[in-house]
Amino acid sequence: WPNKIEPGK
């Protein structure tokens, strides 16, 4: 899912 640590994952 998209998150703030690794966007795009």
From Swiss-Prot:
Keywords, in A-Z order: Cytolysis, Secreted
Tissue spec. comment: Expressed by the venom gland.
Compartmental location: Secreted
A Gene Ontology BP annotation from the UniProt entry: killing of cells of another organism
GO CC terms: extracellular region
Function noted in UniProt: Presents weak hemolytic activity at physiological concentrations (micromolar range). Does not induce mast cell degranulation, weak lactate dehydrogenase (LDH) release from mast cells and antimicrobial effects. In vivo, injection into mice induces increase in nociceptive sensibility, but causes very reduced or no edema formation. It also causes no alteration in rearing (standing on hind limbs) and does not impact locomotion.
Protein name: Cryptide Pep-6
